[in-house]
Regions:
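Active-site catalytic motif of lipid deacylating hydrolases and related acyltransferases
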Residues: 13-21, 29-31, 45-187
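Terminal low-complexity/disordered tails
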Residues: 1-28, 56-63, 206, 228-233, ...
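Alpha/beta-hydrolase-fold catalytic nucleophile elbow
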Residues: 95, 223-224, 321
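Gly/Ala-rich beta-loop-alpha elbow adjacent to hydrolase catalytic centers
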Residues: 193-203
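Hydrophobic residues on the short alpha-helix immediately C-terminal to a glycine-rich phosphate/catalytic loop
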Residues: 202-210
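Loop/turn elements at helix/coil->beta-strand transitions in domains of secreted/extracellular proteins
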Residues: 5-9, 86-88, 186-191, 215-219, ...
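A conserved short beta-strand
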Residues: 213-232
Length: 684
């Protein structure tokens, strides 16, 4: 029998400091939810078996070995497991690749693996406006000798100077080119782009670059985006004071430019509503109006009426998933819409009517109930009973910035800076203790956002999932790094620092960092620690002249002194993170239940006719590591593999290459900034 076609393509786009840790869970849930939406559950189909069109996730081979190194045998030829699959999902992978020169310049400031790259790039180099994707990276200098690390209270999130953000613009171009590859294979294929965190900035920028190519995706789902619409932000203005545009303006991207850019994005997607295929064609290929088990079936018309925006269409839609508990993009210098959502006024000012919808994922608040209600941030927060932290919006309370002498000394590369860090410590310790500026912003008093996404077939309370277990509270408290250790590990060597660390309780006594993970989560922890150790080793003079760190290289030999230092550092990193706050930043997408019950109803539905060979080629193209080796040289996008291979494009530094040609900033991404260019002769 002929297999029922897939309903379209869904592209996942991860954020910074990430290799798509949510991809597998979200794909699993999405496939299950689409089986329900399309009436393809086993009991609903007349014919048994997986070959009838029931959606099955695509499985991928592990990327790391147990020691936390990249598996050298993994390649474009075997990164997809051979087991049967029938999935609409493509995993888009992107990041920062350091040249040999970059390793010497930035290797002591950013995480890099043994091949000198990092998925999503450094955590500290995120941004809150699309125009910033074409600017210099973070400048960690606050004032004279003071750096961001002097005041950073979050362990494991070192903030140092970062490389140019051109790798974001390059990733956006690759995503736009991937959209073109799909459209070239099937012009009317439904495409939904699902973005998380900083991946939203890549995804939105790709929409503008795709428009330049004459193509576009049909739907976007924006999860936890850092895109900020707050009118004023003095903290971000100060951080961005050295950032300039072509007109010589400096500082934060202006409020008006942010609104105009988002309005331009909405216009691009709104135009896709008219590209939905005729209902008759969808029904001819996919209808199941009377399932075998007597349950409600699927027809295009009923699907659009129930789950389409305004009961009309499943194309031409942007859906925002925001989380009021997100402790990453609620940072005072960011305040993204993935935390605070969009108010009715902001929706109106950006022309969101008829294209924009939003869902709130919050503790004890049902997702998918009938729309027309407002989510009141403070009112919902004050419903907590019992309330462990009365008066604080954040649970636990947001950590206050405080003067950290050791961090400040480490962050300064000059002797003068180190000396001044010590001499000024008494003053700044008292001053920061008195000010008690918090890392995370609070919502404005009375802040409300409308919940206007279509009702779901089954509303549900969101659940955070850690190490395969559902948590009682969606707004989690602590998330110690040590939990990622393998709970079933046996025969660990006695000198292993992950074993030596033991078990430590959190400061509230309610939790601990006892191992809850498996071999994969521990491998990921070791992988991240190796990157952190490389950075520390370069900063402390323990690296080779070329920046390499033999003790963190597969097959490399470490001296006894380095091994002792390494063991001490790992134990300290684990200890420092015992009281790490749960970020609640990936909670929406790491639970497959959320994708099954919500995401599956927010994607565009149509008929996808891509062949199995098409799917494999597209999945190879979507992974920046495999373009050169996995695509034929005749492929129109083969050339994009140069960046991962060398750190250059057209043999130019990436920041030079993106200034002109296909990767230049589109005019629809507006770049006006807070401070005007100084007049000639003006006093400085």
């Amino acid at each position: 029998p002929c297999r029922l076609p897939l309903p379209g393509v869904v592209i996942f786009v991860h954020g910074v400091n990430s290799d798509g840790e949510w991809y597998d869970a979200a794909e699993q849930g999405l496939c299950e939810g689409l089986n329900t939406r399309l009436a393809r559950q086993a009991a609903q189909l007349a014919l048994p078996g997986d070959g009838t069109g029931r959606l099955i996730p695509c499985a991928y081979t592990p990327e790391l070995d147990a020691a936390g190194f990249i598996d050298p045998d993994r390649s474009h030829a075997n990164f997809i497991q051979p087991q049967p699959h029938w999935s609409p999902v493509i995993h888009f992978r992107w990041g920062y690749k350091a040249t040999k020169r970059d390793v010497k310049t930035f290797g002591d400031s950013v995480f890099l693996n043994e091949d000198d790259y990092w998925g999503g790039g450094p955590f500290a180099n995120g941004c809150s406006a699309l125009a910033d994707l074409w600017t210099d990276g973070l400048n960690d200098r606050l004032f004279l000798w003071l750096t961001a690390q002097h005041l950073n209270p979050v362990p494991g999130r070192e903030v140092y100077h970062c490389p140019h953000r051109a790798y974001y613009a390059f990733a956006a171009l690759r995503l736009a080119r991937l959209l073109k590859s799909i459209r070239d294979k099937q012009a009317d294929c439904p495409i939904t782009v699902v973005c998380h965190s900083q991946g939203n900035m890549v995804g939105l920028a790709a929409a503008f670059l795709a428009d330049r190519l004459g193509i576009q995706a049909d739907n976007y789902v924006l999860c936890n985006p850092p895109l900020s619409l707050v009118d004023k932000n003095g903290t971000e203005d100060w951080v961005q004071r050295y950032t300039t545009n072509g007109a010589g303006q400096s500082g934060r991207v202006s409020h008006g430019a942010r609104l105009d850019t988002l309005a331009n994005f909405f216009k691009l997607l709104k135009a896709r509503a008219g590209c939905e295929p005729p209902a008759e064609r969808v029904d001819q290929c996919m209808a199941n109006p009377q399932p075998a088990d007597g349950s409600p079936g699927f027809t295009a018309a009923s699907d659009r009426q129930q789950w389409g925006l305004d009961g009309r269409h499943t194309h031409g839609r942007v859906t925002l998933y925001c989380n009021p508990h997100d402790q990453v993009i609620s940072a005072d210098s960011v305040q993204g819409i993935g935390w605070r959502g969009m108010s009715a006024d902001e929706i109106a000012k950006t022309g969101g009517a008829g294209v924009f919808a939003q869902r709130v994922f919050a503790h004890a608040y049902p997702v998918g109930a009938a729309g027309g209600k407002d989510y009141d941030f403070w009112a919902e927060r004050n419903k907590r009973d019992p309330d462990p932290y009365p008066g604080s919006f954040w649970i636990p309370p947001s950590p206050p910035a405080h003067y950290a002498l050791q961090q400040g000394v480490t962050s300064n590369q000059s002797v003068v800076g180190k000396v001044l860090s010590v001499l000024s410590a008494p003053f700044f310790i008292v001053a920061t203790g008195a000010v008690k500026a918090r890392v995370n912003a609070d919502p404005r008093t009375g802040w409300k956002i409308p919940i206007n996404a279509p009702a779901l077939p089954e509303s549900f309370l969101p659940e955070a999932r850690h190490y395969g277990e559902a948590l009682k509270e969606f707004d989690a408290s602590f998330d110690p790094a040590g939990k990622a250790r393998n709970r079933n590990r046996a025969n660990a060597p006695p000198d292993d620092p992950y074993t030596q660390h033991g078990v430590h309780r959190t400061r509230d006594g309610r939790d601990s960092d006892a191992p809850l993970g498996n071999e994969h989560t521990e491998a990921q922890l070791r992988y991240e620690h190796r990157a952190q150790l490389r950075m520390k080793a370069r900063r402390q003079g323990k690296a080779e002249a070329d920046g390499s760190v033999p003790g963190e290289t597969q097959g490399g030999s470490a001296s006894a002194d380095y091994q002792a230092w390494r063991t001490g550092e790992i134990r300290q990193m684990l200890k420092d993170c015992v009281n790490a706050h749960a970020t609640d930043h990936s909670s929406i997408l790491t639970n497959p239940m959320h994708a099954e019950k919500a995401l599956a109803y927010d994607v565009a539905i149509g008929v996808c006719t891509l062949s199995e060979q098409d799917w494999r080629e597209l999945r190879v193209e979507a992974d920046w590591r495999y373009c050169f080796k996995g695509l034929p040289e005749t492929h129109p996008h083969y050339y994009l593999g140069e960046y991962f291979s060398s750190g250059f494009m057209a043999k130019q530094p990436l920041e030079e290459w993106v200034k002109s040609g296909e990767a230049r900033r589109p005019a629809g991404i507006v770049d006006t900034r807070t401070y005007a260019r100084p007049e000639p002769g003006a006093a400085s």
